[in-house]
């Protein structure tokens, strides 16, 4: 049972009662069995997302395939030297919001596994087809707003399938999620941080 929970080592101490009970307690409760069990959960030695596996202490930058290869997104996975929580950072839900996309690119370049605890997953441009075709922030083939179709549909339109892949293949693997947005390509806003 413990192995199914990821426990890698178990230690028992049946002599603990001699160290924690007073002489009076030993006389009164000596027949009560007392022991300490210590179990340690093994730290994951790698992180797998889509078709990419990254070992602890390593960094991957490149394409990550989802939905049996039907969806390919540019990403970075930083698997820190020390185990911990997993953070997802996404940009480009609206492909014309360049500030979030650029922030993802820069974070992916700067963050290093030696200075990271846990795992950081950066998906730089979720709406990749519209971004690559400079076609605004809606789905290229279906005209849908990715931000409005979650959790998606595996048999739906382009954006619905993308939302479904993110919902089913990415969300279950992360503890925290930051989705970066900014002014869209049609808005006259100066990029800023506040």
Report each predicted region and the residues it spans.
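Short coil/loop residues immediately preceding or within conserved phosphate-binding loops
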Residues: 12, 34, 72
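Structured loop/turn residues at beta-strand edges in well-structured enzyme cores
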Residues: 5, 30, 172
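Structured catalytic-domain cores with a bias toward divalent-metal coordination
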Residues: 37-194
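Core SAM-dependent methyltransferase catalytic element
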Residues: 20-42
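Conserved S-adenosyl-L-methionine
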Residues: 3-21
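A generic signature of intrinsically disordered, low-complexity regions enriched in glycine/proline
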Residues: 17-19, 32, 149, 183
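Low-complexity, intrinsically disordered/propeptide-like segments
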Residues: 5-8, 24, 38-39, 52
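A generic structural signal for short
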Residues: 1, 24, 154-155
């Amino acid at each position: 049972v413990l192995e199914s929970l990821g426990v890698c080592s178990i230690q028992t101490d049946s002599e603990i009662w001699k160290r924690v009970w007073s002489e009076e307690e030993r006389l009164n409760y000596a027949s009560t069995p007392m022991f300490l069990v210590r179990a340690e959960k093994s730290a994951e030695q790698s992180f797998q997302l889509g078709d990419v596996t990254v070992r602890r202490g390593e960094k991957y930058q490149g394409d990550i395939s989802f939905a049996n290869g039907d969806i390919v997104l540019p990403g970075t996975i930083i698997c820190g030297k020390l185990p911990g929580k997993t953070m997802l950072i996404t940009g480009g839900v609206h492909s014309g919001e360049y500030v979030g996309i650029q922030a993802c690119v820069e974070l992916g370049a700067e963050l290093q596994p030696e200075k990271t605890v846990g795992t950081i997953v950066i998906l730089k441009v979720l709406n990749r087809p519209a971004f690559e075709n400079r076609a605004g922030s809606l789905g290229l083939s279906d005209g849908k707003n990715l931000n409005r179709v979650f959790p998606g549909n595996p048999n739906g339109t382009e954006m619905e399938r993308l939302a479904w892949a993110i919902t089913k293949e990415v969300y279950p693997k992360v503890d925290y999620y930051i989705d970066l947005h900014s002014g869209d390509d049609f808005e006259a806003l100066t990029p800023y941080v506040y």
